[in-house]
Amino acid sequence: MNNKTRKVLVPLIAIVFGFLLGAIIMLAFGYNPIWGYEDLFISALGSARSIGETLQTMGPLILTALSFAVAMKVGLFNIGMSGQALAGWISSMWFALSFPDIPRLLMIPLVVIIGMVFGAFMGFIPGILRALLGTSEVITTIMLNYIMLFFSTFMIHSMFQKNILMDNTTDQTKLISANASFRTNWMSSLTDNSTLNIGLIIAIIALVIMAIIFTKTTLGFEIKAVGLNPDASEYAGISAKRTLILSMVVAGALAGLGGVVYGFGYMQNFVSQSASLDIGFYGMAVALLGGNSPIGILFAALLFSVLQTGAPGMTNDGIPPEIVKVVTAAIIFFIAVKFIIEVMLPKAKAIKASEATKKKGEKA
């Protein structure tokens, strides 16, 4: 079995196993899995509005998945997308609410740039610590998630101007003005007043740009080279330290952009968070399922968006929507142990070939 076929089969097998495990759990608790999955897909794709909501969910997932993929290609495990996205969200939201009268054509690029800059800074910290001190990026990105989580709460409680906060609360801001929102009338009317917004277009543009960088540029080659062998890259004249830092900066910028898309496309304000943003961890799952490739990320983001958007529909048959989280976790699990699947597939093929040879020998 060639490598391309394996890259396609392994995620598909993981998805099938994930849905099978979800079905087994539903059966064990007396629910009908066929009805449950039917309600899930109808809820996610059964109307123009639900399709719009599913597509809207894809935007932040694509961007955080790209963030994880960039780091993985250089050999780093970026678990800091939640903190990086949160940094992008709160910084850009603060700007938009503080200067609400900026024209839309100027406001949209500015909030995008601000979110990416602050996300990039959150990626720069673990990048430089890893490059110069050898500090594990896993530990630093996890810690930075918590630092950003609590710092964002401090910011909204103590640093935000009172005139941009919602009345009688310090836990959320007022809604952004129409000139800052990523929602458009034509996208809303096209999908029966869903929250579909230009964030999806921004995410797809980022996807195309990263695909070009990975395959057509010197930077993409250097990232892959350092990821495969840092020492050999240094010998060939590629600075591994510079590439590590730059990769984490790019990863942070993409995650920060994901936070901007989430805030200005879906939320429309900033709300104090009690836990890390889901889009960070789901982005990791999307990247793993998509094999860290842009096209794989696109389809994986669609699947996870369907699962998230359709989950509430399962309650129509009394099935807890948390079952979808089991399916999601199972898919991630089977992707994580894909080497087992990759070993099993060649062995199964070898056994079949051996049996076929024996049968031919017996006939002869």
UniProtKB/Swiss-Prot annotation:
Keyword annotations of the record: Cell membrane, Membrane, Transmembrane, Transmembrane helix, Transport
Quaternary assembly: The complex is composed of two ATP-binding proteins (NupA), two transmembrane proteins (NupB and NupC) and a solute-binding protein (BmpA).
The record's induction entry says:
Constitutively expressed.
Q: What is this protein called?
A: Nucleoside ABC transporter permease protein NupB
What Gene Ontology cellular-component terms does the record carry?
plasma membrane
Tell me where it mainly resides: membrane
Q: Name one GO molecular function term.
A: transmembrane transporter activity
Please list every transmembrane segment annotated in the UniProt record, as residue ranges: 9-29, 77-99, 105-125, 138-158, 195-215, 244-264, 284-304, 326-346
Q: List the membrane topology term(s).
A: Multi-pass membrane protein
Q: What does this protein do?
A: Part of an ABC transporter complex involved in the uptake of all common nucleosides. Responsible for the translocation of the substrate across the membrane.
Its subcellular locations are: Cell membrane
